[in-house]
């Protein structure tokens, strides 16, 4: 399991990093690229899991105690470009650029997916 943001989302972290996304922090590409390279061709796809909390983001305790409010989950399987498992992120600048572009597109789609999920939840309440 890899969390590309590297940390939990908070409004303060979102402001500090000037994230271009509405619901996400900026992804950190290096760890994901390193993992794919280390695992070689063992992975052909990844599961992209988006979680939205229409009633507000719960604390860890609220999650653990079953008081998280509504939780929406969207899961999709995405193919991993085969060459992403064979290039060295730290030394190959062209690959690093391609990988950043791919992850940025994925994050833009993910941010829109969360926006759609929250809008859908709001429409159900209205």
Task: Set out the residue ranges of the language-model regions.
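A cross-family acyltransferase "interaction/gating" segment
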Residues: 1-88
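Accessory terminal regions of nucleic-acid processing enzymes
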Residues: 86-126
């Amino acid at each position: 399991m890899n969390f590309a943001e590297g940390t939990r989302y908070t409004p303060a972290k979102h402001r500090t990093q000037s994230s271009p996304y509405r619901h996400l922090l900026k992804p950190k590409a290096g760890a994901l690229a390193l993992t794919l390279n280390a695992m070689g061709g063992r992975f052909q796809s990844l599961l992209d899991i988006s979680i939205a909390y229409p009633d507000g983001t719960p604390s860890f305790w609220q999650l653990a105690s079953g008081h998280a409010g509504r939780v929406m989950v969207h899961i999709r399987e995405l193919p991993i470009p085969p060459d992403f498992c064979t290039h060295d992120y730290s030394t190959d600048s062209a690959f690093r650029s391609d990988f950043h572009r791919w992850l940025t597109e994925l994050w833009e789609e993910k941010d829109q997916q969360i926006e759609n999920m929250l809008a859908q939840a709001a429409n159900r309440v209205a």
